[in-house]
Amino acid sequence: MYRRPGSTLRAAKQALQVNTSISPAEVFRHLEILERQNDGPLVVQQRYFDACEAALGLMEALDEALLRPDVRLTGRLVQGHWNQSAEIRLRVHASAEEVRPVLEHLAFDPRSETMSTRVGPCTAWIDDQSPPMIRVISVPSPARKFANESLVVGGTTVPLDLDEVRRRCLKHRRGS
């Protein structure tokens, strides 16, 4: 098992400094579960790219479906240390009324919160703000119920356009 010395205590201290709906006891219990997981850095890194691949498929589908030239897609890759998750947050620069029919046409039900991807099931949902944001999240089973609690985030990229997400996925597939 890969050990992260002191990470539980450090992550818990960070997590408890953030306003959240999760109680301190739940934070510690969940972090203890993560300590027992066999998740070394390579597993977490692979999960990050799995989320990127899942998001790339959705970005490409939206790019084809939203034909208006003023609609832009950007994404931020996020890696969460506390829940060992990886996610990409897709921001669609269009109104929610335009995005919903496209998602329904792609057979993606925003209310189901789950979509099947090449890398397995991913939790996904729409954040109904303006502009709407679609988050495609790849989370291990023990952490799935905590996926919407973004407590201790390891890092966030600057906004990436579709071409940059595509380039990163291709680079990873080639093993570089």
Task: Specify the residue positions occupied by each region the protein language model found.
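Catalytic core of pol beta-like nucleotidyltransferases
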Residues: 2-85, 93-176
